[in-house]
């Protein structure tokens, strides 16, 4: 048993079987109130156990999940995204959570909105296969990834695009999304200011790239 306190992870290894128990830490602040939710009925029945824990708002939960799916493109993230798209759908509230994730991320927004597609066959075979009772093939992974990218792009209206450009241009307009007091957003702005000061040409290239993606 290994307890990694700094990342809130418990790793169990017995007879060649490894189980990782992780708690997602929230350092960005909450865009809504947390709610306590019980373990789903299927898991309660499977493991004959019960627990309940506080969860971030659904919009932030899936907004962050979508940012992660666009960033690292891991099969587990895209599996969760497929379930979202097949059930709740990509709602306005989830879009709000996505935009919060975009302006809190260390990655440039244009890279998340128009990601370079990664070959994830090895990750799929070694880090996903056998984990889910619901069928999810590699072909479905690729189709879900393309669907997500298209869904995100088409969901952004002119106000959303103007907000992203204003923040990345270091003249944020908070009239649409009032994220100005969140520590992650303040940190993003500080990093952008330093980036513009230290590398003005590359900074402008990234602004132009964002404009290009938002015109697609």
Where are these predicted regions, by residue range?
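Long, low-complexity C-terminal extensions of enzymes
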Residues: 129-216
């Amino acid at each position: 048993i290994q307890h990694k306190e700094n990342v809130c992870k418990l790793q169990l290894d017995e007879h060649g079987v490894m189980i990782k128990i992780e708690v997602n830490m929230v350092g960005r602040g909450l865009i809504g109130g947390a709610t306590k939710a019980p373990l789903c009925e299927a898991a309660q029945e499977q493991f004959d156990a019960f627990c309940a824990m506080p969860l971030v708002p659904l919009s932030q939960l899936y907004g962050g999940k979508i940012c992660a799916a666009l960033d690292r493109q891991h099969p587990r993230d895209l599996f969760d995204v497929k379930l979202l798209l097949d059930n709740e759908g990509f709602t306005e509230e989830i879009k709000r959570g996505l935009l919060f994730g975009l302006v809190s991320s260390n990655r440039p927004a244009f890279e998340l909105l128009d990601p370079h597609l990664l070959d994830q066959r090895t990750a799929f075979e070694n880090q996903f296969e056998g984990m889910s009772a619901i069928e999810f093939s590699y072909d479905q992974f690729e189709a879900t990834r393309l669907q997500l990218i298209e869904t995100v792009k088409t969901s952004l209206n002119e106000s959303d695009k103007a907000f992203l450009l204003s923040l990345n241009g270091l003249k944020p307009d908070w009239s649409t999304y009032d994220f100005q007091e969140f520590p992650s957003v303040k940190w993003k702005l500080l990093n952008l200011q330093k980036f513009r000061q230290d590398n003005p040409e590359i900074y402008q290239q990234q602004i132009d790239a964002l404009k290009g993606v938002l015109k697609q």
